[in-house]
């Protein structure tokens, strides 16, 4: 029985091969009974192949492609969208180039700005470029879950805030983070740490300029961002100007984690590819997880040995908070590792890249830079440095950051999608079936000329009320500009991120004038990884305008 199954399943090529020999069909006149049996099964293989091809083609003809076959019947009107390629759908559009721009073009082509269907292999997906539909997708309880990526499942054990399914455990994590890490009083309590990080960054920038005549800005921003989150989460900071072995290993782990979480993995959408691991996602995650576990576990154990640190005061870090939890709130070690490591991934990438985009625009627009510096001189002067309390008095600085967020949203597709938990009627007769991956093209919304005047121009004044602009809340209340998402799954660290970026931009502009470098012109080309970053890192010349060494921050 076993041998017969083997010859029947793979013996078709034995029948076909003789047709191409000099004996041709005469081969079968002298063939064994097993070969003749294989030949008789050949029509069955042809029939099955024809049926499979027809099934693929029929499903492919559905709007949105293969994964949408039969799903449009749940609504009165089919959701328009591209067919893509048979079997793989629109996977190429998502994995090559800039998917937010490609999807925006496809939505225009299919008249599907409100809602567009498309297939990612076996995954049915929808995307919107409309603020009102975006509000429904982001705030409806029917879209409160996230599709789980293989890399997130392995690196974060599916237990971190970003990917935990909607329910009691997720609500517990959200409550803990909101109360003990991202609450306004906690953000204010850690101002001294943020000031120390930015002063160290300014010093390193000045040293690099004096030694090389040009500064590669991103690495300084990433080092400061890593120290900022390490200080508030783990209670540790590093000297980024002199990388020891521990700092080097930490940077390597963070960089590898960024790459893995940001990689578009075909195996997430074509399950039969998972055992093959064509992009080596599984293998790389398997190598990284033990290193991450060891690193975080050592810090947790160190905190356990220093019990006197765990006090109720504002200066305790997030590890102290997690260790102090009791009863039903207490997390096991694996959950703690997932939550703490997620803070590193989510807390460093966006802050550094948004600051880099902001500074790049200011180098390209010296008139905006001078205007921001004039505001700083009027409010802060030259006799002290910028503090958190100054930021509300610096509306133009805040407008500059908002405009950078509008032009270069760190997550142009809001980083991680949503997953519908049941059929949802979206209006106009369209229905999003349960189990559909739902996305918002925030880049398309922030570059829509029907929403924003001259959307491709850098104009911070559009957000300055006393200059005829409009006050726009970027924290998720106004879906015309919601770079941190909205609803239950809004980024919990949005307030900390904005406070950090506003302070950094203000201090960078206060202490230096930023000029372009002749050999490294500013290039705003994009590359989408975990976040959308500058394809060519920013290089520029910082000229001291207010010496920072004399200030004690």
From Swiss-Prot:
Its cofactor is heme. Heme binds at residue 491. The keyword Oxidoreductase applies. It is an enzyme of class 1 (oxidoreductase). Keywords: Heme, Iron, Metal-binding, Monooxygenase, Oxidoreductase. Its EC number is 1.14.-.-. GO terms for molecular function: heme binding; iron ion binding; monooxygenase activity; oxidoreductase activity, acting on paired donors, with incorporation or reduction of molecular oxygen. Belongs to the cytochrome P450 family. This is Cytochrome P450 78A4. It comes from Pinus radiata.
């Amino acid at each position: 029985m076993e041998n017969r199954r083997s010859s029947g399943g793979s013996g078709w090529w034995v029948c076909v091969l003789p047709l191409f020999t000099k004996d041709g069909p005469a081969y079968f006149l002298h063939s064994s009974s097993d070969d003749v049996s294989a030949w008789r099964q050949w029509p069955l293989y042809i029939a099955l192949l024809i049926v499979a091809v027809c099934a693929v083609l029929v499903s492919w003809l559905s709007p949105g492609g293969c994964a949408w076959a039969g799903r449009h019947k749940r609504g009165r009107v089919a959701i328009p969208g591209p067919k893509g390629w048979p079997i793989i759908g629109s996977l190429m559009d998502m994995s090559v180039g800039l998917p937010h721009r490609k999807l925006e073009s496809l939505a225009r082509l299919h008249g599907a700005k409100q809602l567009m269907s498309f297939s990612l292999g076996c995954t049915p997906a929808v995307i919107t470029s409309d603020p009102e539909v975006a509000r429904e997708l982001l705030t409806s309880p029917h879209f409160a879950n996230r599709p789980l990526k293989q890399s997130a499942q392995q690196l974060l054990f599916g237990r971190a805030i970003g990917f935990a399914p909607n329910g009691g455990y997720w609500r517990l994590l959200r409550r803990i983070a909101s109360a003990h890490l991202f609450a306004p009083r906690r953000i204010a309590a850690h101002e001294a740490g943020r000031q120390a990080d930015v002063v160290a960054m300014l010093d390193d920038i000045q040293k690099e300029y004096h030694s090389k005549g040009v500064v590669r800005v991103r690495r300084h921003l990433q080092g400061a961002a890593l120290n900022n989150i390490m200080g508030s989460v783990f209670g540790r900071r590093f000297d980024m100007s002199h990388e020891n072995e521990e700092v080097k290993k930490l940077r390597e782990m963070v960089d590898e984690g960024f790459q893995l979480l940001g990689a578009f993995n075909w195996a997430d959408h074509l399950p039969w590819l998972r055992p093959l691991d064509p992009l080596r996602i599984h293998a790389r995650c398997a190598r990284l997880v033990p290193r991450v576990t060891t690193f975080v576990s050592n810090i947790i154990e160190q905190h356990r040995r220093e019990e006197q640190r765990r006090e109720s005061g504002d200066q305790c870090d997030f590890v102290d908070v997690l260790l102090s939890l009791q009863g039903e709130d207490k997390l096991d070690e694996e959950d703690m590792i997932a939550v703490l490591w997620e803070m590193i991934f989510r807390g460093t990438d966006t802050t550094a890249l948004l600051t880099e985009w902001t500074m790049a625009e200011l180098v390209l627009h010296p008139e905006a830079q001078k205007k921001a510096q004039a505001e700083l001189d009027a409010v802060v002067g030259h006799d002290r440095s910028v503090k958190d309390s100054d930021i509300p008095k610096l509306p133009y600085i805040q407008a500059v950051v908002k405009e950078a967020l509008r032009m270069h949203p760190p997550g142009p597709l809001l980083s991680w999608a949503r997953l519908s938990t049941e059929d949802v009627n979206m209006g106009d007769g369209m229905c999003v079936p349960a189990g559909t991956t739902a996305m918002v093209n925030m880049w398309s919304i922030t570059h829509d000329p029907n929403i924003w005047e001259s959307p491709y121009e850098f104009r911070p004044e559009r957000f300055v009320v006393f200059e005829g602009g409009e006050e726009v809340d970027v924290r998720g209340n106004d879906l015309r500009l919601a770079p941190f998402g909205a609803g239950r799954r809004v980024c919990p660290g949005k307030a900390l991120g904005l406070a950090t970026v506003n302070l950094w931009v203000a201090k960078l502009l206060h202490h230096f004038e930023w000029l372009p470098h002749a050999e490294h012109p500013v290039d705003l080309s994009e590359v989408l990884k975990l976040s959308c970053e500058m394809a060519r890192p920013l290089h520029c010349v910082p000229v001291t305008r207010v010496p920072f060494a004399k200030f004690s921050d």
